[in-house]
Swiss-Prot record:
Homodimer; PARP-type zinc-fingers from separate parp1 molecules form a dimer module that specifically recognizes DNA strand breaks. The gene is parp1. One of its GO terms (cellular component) is site of double-strand break. Residues 211-345 form the PADR1 zinc-binding domain. It comes from Xenopus laevis. A zinc finger (PARP-type) spans 1-78, 99-189. Residues 369-460 form the BRCT domain. Keywords: ADP-ribosylation, Allosteric enzyme, Chromosome, Cytoplasm, DNA damage, DNA repair, DNA-binding, Glycosyltransferase, Immunity, Innate immunity, Isopeptide bond, Metal-binding, NAD, Nucleotidyltransferase, Nucleus, Repeat, Transcription, Transcription regulation, Transferase, Zinc, Zinc-finger. This is Poly [ADP-ribose] polymerase 1. The two PARP-type zinc-fingers (also named Zn1 and Zn2) specifically recognize DNA strand breaks: PARP-type zinc-finger 1 binds PARP-type zinc-finger 2 from a separate parp1 molecule to form a dimeric module that specifically recognizes DNA strand breaks. The PADR1-type (also named Zn3) zinc-finger mediates an interdomain contact and is required for the ability of parp1 to regulate chromatin structure. Residues 348-361 have a biased composition (Pro residues). The modification PolyADP-ribosyl glutamic acid is found at E391, E397, E419, E428, E429, E445, E447, E454, E467, E471, E477, E495, E496, E503. It catalyses: NAD(+) + (ADP-D-ribosyl)n-acceptor = nicotinamide + (ADP-D-ribosyl)n+1-acceptor + H(+); L-seryl-[protein] + NAD(+) = O-(ADP-D-ribosyl)-L-seryl-[protein] + nicotinamide + H(+); L-aspartyl-[protein] + NAD(+) = 4-O-(ADP-D-ribosyl)-L-aspartyl-[protein] + nicotinamide; L-glutamyl-[protein] + NAD(+) = 5-O-(ADP-D-ribosyl)-L-glutamyl-[protein] + nicotinamide.
Length: 998
C-alpha cells in the first residue's frame, strides 16, 4: 500500500502503508472505466477467485516472498485455513471460499446448469462469480444441482485436487448427504506421487527429458528470484538516498519519459538500472513500460488509437549515471551490468490488450469461429433429444455456434414436437422471445453441408420464430439482392443488451437551435446559449477498443429564459448504459460561464471552441455533429388525428402511415445497435454518415490487403466514434471481416433513408388546414393510385407473385393486400431516353418499410462513392430480381411484423453482360447496358406476357439448365439510375408457416 489511507472493502479497516494489499477491479458506476476495490491480503481471498499468477496485474513486481505467498494461495484455490477462514471441512483441509453447499432456502433459485428449479430443502452447490453486467456487486452465488455441478466440474474450475469436504457449509450437512457429495466430488490422488509413478514407467530417454524440464524450471525460478531481489534492492536503496526530483533527473538523463506518481518513477528507474535504458518504440517512437508479462508501448499510433506494440525483448542501451549524482554514495558505486529480463511461464504475452487488472474471475468476450455454418448462432436446447446434451453441445460448437443458457440469449432453439405441444414454462419463454424452434434432425443435415437457411425452414416445428441473421452469408445468396444499394439488412446477430442499459426515454425540449439535456432539469425555464451563430452545446465521443471503452461526454451552457442566470452542465459515461454521472454548476456571470465552457471543451478535445478546423488528439474526445432542429412533437403530429380530413383513398392513407412510422424507424436503429440516447432518431448529420462510409472503405481495403491489426483498430475506433453504437458492457468488436463491414454499410444505407423520412416528417410547418397525412403525401412527390382488384393489371401482377415464389423460400406465403400504381415526379422524363431500348422488363425490388419514404421521394439510388464495394456481388448498382420471394426477403418482415412493401420497376436492360460468379463491375463492357447474374432457377420464359409494352416474366420457376453458377436465382443490375422507372408498389402480408427463412 502506498499510504495508510485505503480501507479494506471486506472488513472496513485501513490497509497499513507498505503492507500487501490486493484489489478487485470493478466497473465504476460513475464513469466508463474500472476502479480498484482494495482488500487486506487475508480478506481478498474470501471474495476473489484467482486461477493463476498471471491474473494478478503487478504480481511479478512484488517482493519474492509476497509472490511465493500468493502462488501458494492460488494452488490451494485461494482457500483460507484457520484464522480468517471458514470452518475446516476435514483434517488438514482448507475451506474453499468461492464454493459452497447448503440446503435451498426456498424454491426460487434456478440451476445454472439445467436451468430447472431447485426445490426448497434440496442440496445445492454454488460457485461464486462476477456478473459481467453488474460487476459492482462483486462475487455472487451461482447455484447448481449437485449432479449438474459435477458434470460441469472442469469448466467451473473445481480442481481435481479439491474435494466435497472443502465446500463452505459442508459441515452442516447431514451425514448421508455428506457421503453422497464425497462420492460425487472426490479429490484426485496426489498429483506429485502420480507423476512420480508415471516417470517410473517411462523409458530412460523420457525420464531424461522430464528431468531436464524440471532442472530448467528450477533454474528459471532461481533466476526470477535473483532478478526480483536485485530490483527490490535497487528500489530500497533509491528510496533511502534519492529524492523524487533526483529520480526524475535520472530518467531524463537516460532519455526516458517521466511518469506521474512516485511509485511509477521508482519502478522505471530501477528497471533501467537493472536491465538498461529502453529505446523508443519502432512503430510510434513511444515509451515502453514493463507491465507484468511484457513491455508495452504507451505511445499512440494515431490520434484515434494507442500503439499496441509489446515485446519481452525491447531494445536497450546502457544506463548512465550523470557525474552530478556521484555525490550520492550508492549511485557513485553503482556499476551498470546488462541483464536480460526473465519472465515467468504464467506471464506469457497475450494478444493486443495489456494484462487485465486483478478480477475475481476474468470474463472472456464471446467469440465465434468464422466461416462455419452456425457462426453467430446461439442455440437453446430443450427436452430429451436423440443425443445427450453434451454430444449436441460439442456438435453445435463444431459447427461454429454456441449453446445459450436461456431463451432471451438465444436466436435458435432445438427441441422436439412433444415439447412444443406440451408448452412448458421454458417453451413459453422461447415463444415470448420469438425464438424459432427446429428439431435436432436440423443438426445432422447441417453437418452434411446442406444450406443452413433452407434447413431452418425444412425442420422448423414452431408456429413462431423471428428472423435469424448471420454475419456469414451463404455462398449461393451472398450477393446483394434487390435493395436500393443491394439490400439493406443489418447482417448482424442482435446481441443481448446488459441490464445496465438505460431504458429511460429522453424527451428533448428544443428552444432556439438546440435541445436542453433533460438531465439538467432546467429544460422548462432555460435554453442553450447561442451567440454569434454558435450554439454552446457539444456531444463528444471516444472509443478505444483496446481498453474496451465506449464513452460519451455532453457539455452545455444554459441560460435562463428571463433572468441573467447561467449554468454549465456536463454529463459523461458509457454509451448505452446507466454508467455515468453529471454535474451542474451555476456561474456568477455570462462571461464566467463562457470561459468555463471553453476551458472544459479545450480540456476534453484539445481544441479551441471557436477553431474552424477540428484536430483529433490522442485520448481526447471527438465532437459529433448532432442537429436538434425540431421538437419531436412536430413529428408525432402524423399519428394524432391523422386521416380525419384526408382526401386520399383509405389504402393510400394507410400506406403513408406505414412508411412514416416512427416506431419502426426506432426499431430499425436499435437493430443496428445504434444508441438512441446519444444519437436520437434523425439527428446525425449526413456529412458524418458520409465520413463513416469513407472509413468503411478504408477498412475494406485494410482487410483485403491483410494490413496490420493496429490499422484495423485505428479505423474501428474512428467508425464507432462517428456513429455511436450501443454495445452495453460488451467490448466494441473489431471491424475485421468483410461480412461485418457490409453489415455496417447496410446500416449506413438505412440511416440515410431514415434521415430522409425523418426530415420529411419534421420539415416545414403546415397551416393546420390540411390533414397531416396529405401533407406527408405531398412531400414524397409521388402520385399513388390504388389498382382495382378486378383489373387486368392486378391479375397479371398477382400471377407474377404467385408463380415466382421460389421453392427454397418456403417459410412463408405471400398475400397481396394492395397494389398501388406509382408515378414519381420527374422520373419518367429521366427514363424517356431509355424507353426506346430493347429488353425492358418489369422486375422486383424489395426493401424495408422504413426506406420507402426515401425511395419514393428520391428514387432508387446507387451506393455513394464513399461506400466500400464489399458485399455488392456485381459492383455498385441497383439490383432487381425476377423471383418475387428473392426480393421479398429484403423486406425484412417477420412473424411479429408481417407487413412488407415491394416495388415493381420497368428496367431498361438492353444488351446484358451475363455472369455466373461475382465480378466487381465499375464499367460495363462496350455495347452492354446491364448485368445479368445467371441463376439455376428462372421463370419459364414461354409464359412471359406484356403489360404496357414491357415484358413481365411471370412464368413458374423452372431449371435454367445452368449448373456452374454460384447463384440460385437471376439478378439484374443497372448502373445508371435513369434506366429505372418505378411502376407499382405492392403491400404484402407474409404468412409464416413454421418459422422464418432468410
Amino acid at each position: 500500500a502506498k499510504s495508510g489511507r485505503a480501507s479494506c472493502k471486506k472488513c472496513g479497516d485501513n490497509i497499513a502503508k507498505e503492507s500487501l494489499g490486493l484489489a478487485i477491479m470493478v466497473q465504476s458506476p460513475m464513469f466508463d472505466g474500472k476502479v480498484p476495490h482494495w482488500h487486506h491480503y487475508s480478506c481478498f481471498w474470501k471474495r476473489a477467485r484467482v486461477l493463476s499468477q498471471g491474473d494478478i496485474y503487478g504480481y511479478t513486481e512484488l517482493r519474492w516472498e509476497d509472490q511465493e505467498m500468493i502462488k501458494k494461495a492460488i494452488e490451494t484455490g485461494g482457500a483460507a485455513a484457520g484464522a480468517g477462514g471458514d470452518s475446516k471441512g476435514g483434517k488438514g483441509e482448507m475451506t474453499l471460499n468461492d464454493f459452497a453447499a447448503e440446503y435451498a432456502k426456498s424454491n426460487r433459485s434456478a440451476c445454472k446448469g439445467c436451468e430447472q428449479k431447485i426445490e426448497k430443502g434440496q442440496i445445492r452447490i454454488s460457485k461464486k462469480s462476477v456478473d459481467v453486467e453488474r460487476p459492482q456487486l462483486g462475487m455472487i452465488d451461482r447455484w447448481y444441482h449437485p449432479d449438474c455441478f459435477v458434470s460441469s466440474r472442469e469448466e467451473l474450475d473445481f480442481l481435481p485436487s479439491y474435494s466435497a469436504s472443502q465446500l463452505k457449509g459442508f459441515t452442516i450437512l447431514s451425514a448421508e448427504d455428506k457421503d453422497s457429495l464425497k462420492k460425487k466430488l472426490p479429490a484426485v490422488k496426489n498429483e506429485g506421487k502420480r507423476k512420480a509413478d508415471e516417470v517410473d514407467g517411462h523409458s530412460a530417454a523420457t525420464k531424461k527429458k522430464i528431468k531436464k524440464e524440471k532442472e530448467k524450471e528450477s533454474k528459471l525460478e532461481k533466476l526470477l528470484k535473483e532478478q526480483t531481489e536485485l530490483i527490490w534492492h535497487i528500489k530500497d536503496e533509491l528510496k533511502k538516498v534519492c529524492s523524487t526530483n533526483d529520480l526524475k533527473e535520472l530518467l531524463i538523463a537516460n532519455k526516458q519519459q517521466v511518469p506521474s506518481g512516485e511509485t511509477n518513477i521508482v519502478d522505471r528507474v530501477s528497471d533501467g538500472m537493472a536491465f538498461g535504458a529502453l529505446l523508443p518504440c519502432e512503430e510510434c517512437s513511444g515509451q515502453f513500460v514493463f507491465k507484468g508479462d511484457a513491455y508495452y508501448c504507451t505511445g499512440d499510433l494515431s490520434a484515434w488509437t494507442k500503439c499496441v506494440a509489446k515485446t519481452q525483448t525491447p531494445n536497450r542501451k546502457d544506463w548512465v549515471t550523470p557525474k552530478e549524482f556521484h555525490e550520492i554514495p550508492y549511485l557513485k558505486k553503482f556499476k551498470f551490468k546488462r541483464h536480460d529480463r526473465a519472465f515467468p511461464p504464467c506471464a506469457a504475452p497475450t494478444p493486443i490488450s495489456p494484462p487485465a487488472a486483478p478480477e475475481p474471475k476474468p470474463t472472456v468476450e464471446e467469440t465465434f469461429p468464422e466461416g462455419k455454418p452456425l457462426t453467430n448462432t446461439k442455440v437453446l436446447l430443450i427436452g430429451k433429444l436423440s443425443k445427450n446434451k453434451d454430444e449436441v453441445k460439442t456438435l453445435i460448437e463444431g459447427l461454429g455456434g454456441k449453446v445459450a443458457g436461456s431463451a432471451h440469449k438465444a436466436n435458435l432453439c432445438i427441441s422436439t414436437n412433444k415439447e412444443v405441444k406440451k408448452m412448458s414454462k421454458k417453451m413459453e419463454e422461447v415463444k415470448a422471445a420469438n425464438v424459432r424452434v427446429v428439431s435436432d434432425d436440423f443438426l445432422k443435415e447441417v453437418e452434411s453441408g446442406k444450406s443452413v437457411q433452407e434447413l431452418l425452414s425444412q425442420f422448423g416445428i414452431s408456429s413462431w420464430g423471428a428472423e435469424i441473421k448471420q454475419e456469414a452469408v451463404q455462398p449461393t445468396e451472398k450477393q446483394p439482392s434487390s435493395g436500393p444499394v443491394a439490400g439493406k439488412s443489418s447482417g448482424k446477430v442482435k446481441e443481448e443488451k446488459g441490464s445496465n442499459k438505460s431504458e429511460k426515454k429522453m424527451k428533448l425540449t428544443v428552444k432556439g437551435g438546440a435541445a436542453i439535456d433533460p438531465d439538467s432539469e432546467l429544460e422548462d425555464s432555460c435554453h442553450v446559449l447561442e451567440t454569434g451563430g454558435k450554439i454552446f452545446s457539444a456531444t463528444l465521443g471516444l472509443v478505444d477498443i483496446t481498453r474496451g471503452t465506449n464513452s460519451y461526454y455532453k457539455l452545455q451552457l444554459i441560460e435562463h429564459d428571463r433572468d441573467s442566470r447561467y449554468w454549465v452542465f456536463r454529463s459523461w459515461g458509457r454509451v448505452g448504459t446507466v454508467i455515468g454521472s453529471k454535474k451542474l454548476e451555476e456561474m456568477s456571470s455570462k462571461e464566467d460561464a463562457i470561459e468555463h465552457f471553453l476551458n472544459l471543451y479545450q480540456d476534453k478535445t484539445g481544441n479551441a471552441w471557436h477553431s474552424p478546423n477540428f484536430t483529433k488528439y490522442p485520448k481526447k474526445f471527438y465532437p459529433l455533429e448532432i442537429d436538434y432542429g425540431q421538437e419531436e412533437d412536430v413529428v408525432k403530429k402524423l399519428s394524432v388525428g391523422a386521416g380525419t380530413k384526408s382526401k386520399l383513398a383509405k389504402p393510400v392513407q394507410e400506406l403513408i402511415k406505414l412508411i412514416f412510422d416512427v416506431e419502426s424507424m426506432k426499431k430499425a436503429m436499435v437493430e443496428f445497435e445504434i444508441d438512441l440516447q446519444k444519437m436520437p432518431l434523425g439527428k446525425l448529420s449526413k456529412r458524418q454518415i458520409q465520413s463513416a462510409y469513407s472509413i468503411l472503405s478504408q477498412v475494406q481495403q485494410a482487410v483485403s490487403e491483410s494490413l496490420s491489426e493496429a490499422r484495423l483498430l485505428d479505423l474501428s475506433n474512428q467508425f464507432y466514434t462517428l456513429i455511436p453504437h450501443d454495445f452495453g458492457m460488451k467490448k466494441p468488436p473489431l471491424l475485421n471481416n468483410l461480412e461485418y463491414i457490409q453489415a455496417k454499410v447496410q446500416m449506413l444505407d438505412n440511416l440515410l433513408d431514415i434521415e430522409v423520412a425523418y426530415s420529411l416528417l419534421r420539415g416545414g410547418a403546415d397551416d393546420g388546414e390540411k390533414d397531416p397525412i396529405d401533407v406527408k403525401y405531398e412531400k414524397i412527390k409521388t402520385d399513388i393510385k390504388v389498382v382495382a382488384k378486378d383489373s387486368e393489371e392486378s391479375r397479371i401482377i398477382c400471377d407474377y407473385v404467385k408463380n415466382t415464389h421460389a421453392d427454397t423460400h418456403n417459410a412463408y406465403d405471400l398475400e397481396v393486400l394492395e397494389i398501388f400504381k406509382i408515378d414519381r415526379e420527374g422520373e419518367y422524363q429521366r427514363y424517356k431516353p431509355f424507353k426506346q431500348l430493347h429488353n425492358r422488363q418489369l422486375l422486383w425490388h424489395g426493401s424495408r418499410t422504413t426506406n420507402f419514404a426515401g425511395i419514393l421521394s428520391q428514387g432508387l439510388r446507387i451506393a455513394p462513392p464513399e461506400a466500400p464495394v464489399t458485399g455488392y456481388m456485381f459492383g455498385k448498382g441497383i439490383y432487381f430480381a425476377d423471383m418475387v420471394s428473392k426480393s421479398a426477403n429484403y423486406c425484412h418482415a417477420m412473424p411479429g411484423s408481417p407487413i412488407g412493401l415491394i416495388l415493381l420497376g420497368e428496367v431498361a436492360l438492353g444488351n446484358m453482360h451475363e455472369l455466373k460468379a461475382a465480378s466487381q463491375i465499375t464499367k460495363l463492357p462496350k455495347g452492354k447496358h446491364s448485368v445479368k447474374g445467371l441463376g439455376r432457377t428462372a421463370p419459364d420464359p414461354s409464359a412471359t406476357v406484356q403489360l404496357d409494352g414491357v415484358d413481365v416474366p411471370l412464368g413458374k420457376g423452372t431449371s435454367a439448365n445452368i449448373s456452374d453458377t454460384s447463384l440460385l436465382y437471376n439478378e439484374y443490375i443497372v448502373y445508371d439510375i435513369a434506366q429505372v422507372n418505378l411502376k407499382y408498389l405492392l403491400k404484402l402480408k407474409f404468412n409464416y408457416k413454421g418459422g422464418m427463412m432468410w
